[in-house]
């Protein structure tokens, strides 16, 4: 047997620093929204993405936002303010369910886009 194979020599291997770092937990990341419209638009973009309807998504968000009643817009704005201090994912989901369940008279655009994803 070859004498070199009896006593192996371990050589140091240089590894990139990224392999030694631990992965960050993505679930604890919270997003801070500047105002209610930005929060509403981000949620609606996710819904439109799931439904596969991306044609003019930002324009649709704006139209829907302006057709919402004042108290609904105020609720989204308060949630956006609250996002500066705590995680608001649970409250956002609750507000979305309320919006889905409401049938707003005269807001055909809103009903059309929301009913697609239900």
UniProtKB/Swiss-Prot annotation:
Biological process, per Gene Ontology: induction of conjugation with cellular fusion; mating type determination; positive regulation of induction of conjugation with cellular fusion; positive regulation of meiotic cell cycle; positive regulation of transcription by RNA polymerase II
Keywords for this protein: DNA-binding, Nucleus, Stress response, Transcription, Transcription regulation
DNA-binding region of this protein: 29-97
Location relative to the cell: Nucleus
Function text: Mating type proteins are sequence specific DNA-binding proteins that act as master switches in yeast differentiation by controlling gene expression in a cell type-specific fashion. Required for conjugation and efficient meiosis.
Extra information: There are three genetic loci for mating type genes in S.pombe, mat1, mat2-P and mat3-M. Cell type is determined by the alternate allele present in mat1, either P (plus) in a h+ or M (minus) in a h- cell. Mat2-P and mat3-M serve as donor of information that is transposed to mat1 during a switch of mating type.
Name assigned to this protein: Mating-type P-specific polypeptide Pc
Species annotation: Schizosaccharomyces pombe
Lineage: Eukaryota, Fungi, Dikarya, Ascomycota, Taphrinomycotina
Gene: mat2-Pc
